[in-house]
């Protein structure tokens, strides 16, 4: 327990909150060759590797993921949501924040239905997150 004198001299420092998606908060300025803190909801990138991964202990599956080289120079691992995908090695993708709880090190999601990524086929409910257009009747 600090004394009153110690608190008067130093004061209490507030805890620094850790960011969940740090790659989204930096932008690269190619003119001055320097990164700048400029948060954005999405970032564009190019896939360098597309593969599958097995989840942590109680779960069992083959989860699809991609290594993405972002426009700010960082390389991150992003999850590919939904059934089936058309993402290949040099596909341009858009990523958003949001971790996958049972995949260690995966803190980002790929946005379906934008850039080179197609939406999920034959999806009727919850289409917004999977980039699926409304059916023509």
From Swiss-Prot:
GO cellular component: small ribosomal subunit
GO molecular function per UniProt: rRNA binding; structural constituent of ribosome; tRNA binding
Top-level taxon in the UniProt lineage: Bacteria
One Pfam family named in its UniProt record: Ribosom_S12_S23
InterPro entries named in the record: NA-bd_OB-fold, Ribosomal_uS12, Ribosomal_uS12_bac
GO biological process: translation
The UniProt record lists the keyword rRNA-binding: yes
Residues carrying 3-methylthioaspartic acid: 102
Region (Disordered): 1-20
PROSITE patterns per UniProt: RIBOSOMAL_S12
Swiss-Prot/TrEMBL keywords: Methylation, Ribonucleoprotein, Ribosomal protein, RNA-binding, rRNA-binding, tRNA-binding
Protein purpose: With S4 and S5 plays an important role in translational accuracy.
Assembly behavior: Part of the 30S ribosomal subunit. Contacts proteins S8 and S17. May interact with IF1 in the 30S initiation complex.
PANTHER family: 30S RIBOSOMAL PROTEIN S12 FAMILY MEMBER
Family: Belongs to the universal ribosomal protein uS12 family.
Name this protein carries in UniProt: Small ribosomal subunit protein uS12
